[in-house]
């Protein structure tokens, strides 16, 4: 439960980035003030593409009941509801990995205690970026998107991303998934009935930019999709992977883990049997939440 402290290396990273460039919303300000007022250990949840912060609502309840205070900030300009998101898809366009990372960075630095952070998919990449800046007391990256230095590109991951990557113009667009695309990329490990319910309840359009950034990260030394895996202030990290995940398969999680093992802090990986990319929101979400909670509890 330490205050946020930033060593010289971390400070240089922050100085060179456009930290907090996005406006923090009134709702996010309320979350920050509430967390600080409780005096409890904060946990910050970071969603990925095609989901909203509300995808963490049940997780927040679990962690609050365990004695933490929680925040689930938006990506910049996220609508509050799925219906609003579907009605105004253009607000998602052109959101990059760097912009979103800096937005969460600005939120975290306003907390009086260094938080634990948990992210899913591109949120799993973002929490590793934030931990690499020394801003996390303990981190869980669930089915994380790849970063520079992570080389595997399984065919299922390419197929999942192809609705975006198949057209270069999508780099600057907001892209929705059809039900069939969502079924393959997110909901392949659940029943047809549950898959359709998940699609209706959670799926929203997403920025195409992060997928292009991740896909080209190993070709671009200046990419925003990079992680400082050696910062001694990174803190403990758990990477989890759903066994049946088509979007971020085990090969990507394992390669991310191997890169993160360069760090001196605790680094662990867990494969969760029979789970797909929707593992944080489907009927088995509680299993993943409990694995994450058990890891966080060991350190804060």
Predicted region positions:
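Active-site glycine-rich loops that stabilize anionic/oxyanionic intermediates
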Residues: 48-51, 121, 243-244
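Serine-hydrolase catalytic-loop signature spanning alpha/beta hydrolases and amidase-signature enzymes
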Residues: 50-58, 70
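Conserved alpha/beta-hydrolase
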Residues: 63-87
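Gly/Ala-rich beta-loop-alpha elbow adjacent to hydrolase catalytic centers
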Residues: 118-123, 127
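Flexible "cap/lid" loop of the alpha/beta hydrolase fold
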Residues: 136-171, 212-219
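Short beta-strand/loop motif that positions the catalytic acidic residue
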Residues: 233, 239-241, 245
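Conserved alpha/beta-hydrolase "acid-adjacent" motif
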Residues: 246-255
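Catalytic active-site module of serine/aspartate enzymes centered on a nucleophile-bearing elbow/loop
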Residues: 263-300
């Amino acid at each position: 439960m330490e205050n946020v402290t930033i060593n010289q290396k971390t400070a240089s990273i922050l100085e060179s980035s456009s930290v907090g460039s996005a406006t923090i919303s009134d709702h996010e300000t309320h979350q920050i003030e509430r967390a600080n007022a409780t005096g409890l250990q904060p946990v910050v949840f970071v969603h990925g593409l095609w989901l909203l912060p509300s995808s963490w609502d049940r997780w927040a309840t679990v962690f609050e009941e365990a004695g933490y205070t929680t925040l689930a900030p938006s990506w910049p300009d996220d609508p509050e509801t799925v219906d609003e998101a579907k009605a105004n898809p253009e607000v998602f366009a052109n959101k990059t990995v760097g912009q979103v990372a800096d937005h969460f960075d600005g939120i975290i630095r306003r907390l009086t205690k260094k938080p634990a952070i948990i992210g899913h998919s591109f949120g799993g990449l973002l929490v590793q970026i934030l931990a690499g800046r020394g801003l996390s007391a303990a981190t869980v990256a669930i089915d994380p998107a790849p970063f520079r230095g992570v080389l595997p590109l399984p065919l299922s991951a390419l197929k999942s991303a192809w609705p975006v990557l198949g057209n270069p113009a999508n780099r600057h667009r907001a892209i929705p998934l059809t039900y069939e695309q969502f079924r393959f990329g997110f909901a392949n490990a659940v029943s047809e009935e549950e898959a359709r319910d998940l699609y209706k309840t959670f799926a929203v359009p997403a920025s195409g930019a992060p997928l292009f950034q991740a896909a080209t990260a190993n070709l671009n030394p200046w990419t925003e999709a990079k992680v400082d895996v050696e910062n001694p202030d990174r803190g403990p990290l758990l990477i989890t992977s759903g066994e049946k995940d088509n979007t971020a398969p085990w090969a990507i999680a394992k390669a991310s883990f191997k890169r993160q093992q360069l760090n001196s802090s605790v680094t662990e990986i867990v494969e969760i049997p029979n789970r797909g990319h929707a593992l944080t929101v489907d009927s088995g979400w509680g299993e993943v939440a409990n694995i994450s909670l058990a890891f966080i509890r060991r350190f804060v």
